[in-house]
Regions:
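Acidic/aromatic-lined carbohydrate-recognition and catalytic surfaces
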Residues: 1-164
Length: 165
């Protein structure tokens, strides 16, 4: 496998590109900064870039809102495609870090559960108990990853969740 013989250069794009700590909803092409470093990465002998989470998130990237678009604080999917083209032109592969065992509280299916409670078709996407309350006063209790309630654990035994991912 190619990865076994590769030299990786890891980047945490939200920090590297100077994105705001909180998602303000404003789209700014900051991810292009990575393309500016392609020559440097190549000179170091790295032939792969490992990008920490770039998907739309509430704050730090590990609290995903949308797996289908990059964080607006980094730009658009088209901006990211251009970065990939530049890196590929330098012989550098791109590997994404995706978090698929939990999402952020801003994830669309969790927002639906917050609004509709028992009536949400997505209530079984998470480990939810309607006989308790969360630290955020949601009117139900749910499992947070490692006890962090801003990171809502997905129910990976649910085939609909697996199909979505």
């Amino acid at each position: 496998m190619w990865a076994e013989n590769s030299v990786f250069y890891q980047i945490y794009p939200l920090g590297f590109c100077g994105a705001p700590k909180e998602n303000d909803g404003v789209t700014v092409n900051r991810i292009g900064k990575i393309a500016d470093w392609a020559d440097h990465i190549q000179r170091l002998g790295a032939d792969a870039v490992y990008l920490s989470p770039i998907f739309e998130s509430d704050r730090h990237g590990y609290d995903t809102r949308d797996y289908r678009k990059i964080d607006c604080r980094l730009g658009t999917n088209e901006d990211f495609a251009k970065v990939c083209e530049t890196l590929h032109a330098h012989g550098i592969r791109v590997v994404l870090d995706g978090v698929f065992n939990h999402v952020g509280r801003g994830f669309w299916a969790f927002k639906d559960v917050q609004e509709k409670k028992w009536d949400s078709p997505y209530k079984d996407w998470f480990h939810i108990h309607f006989d308790g309350n969360s630290n955020y006063n949601d009117g139900f209790w749910y499992e947070g990853w490692e006890g962090h309630f801003e990171l809502v654990k997905l129910n990976l035994r649910n085939p609909a969740v697996v199909d979505y991912l």
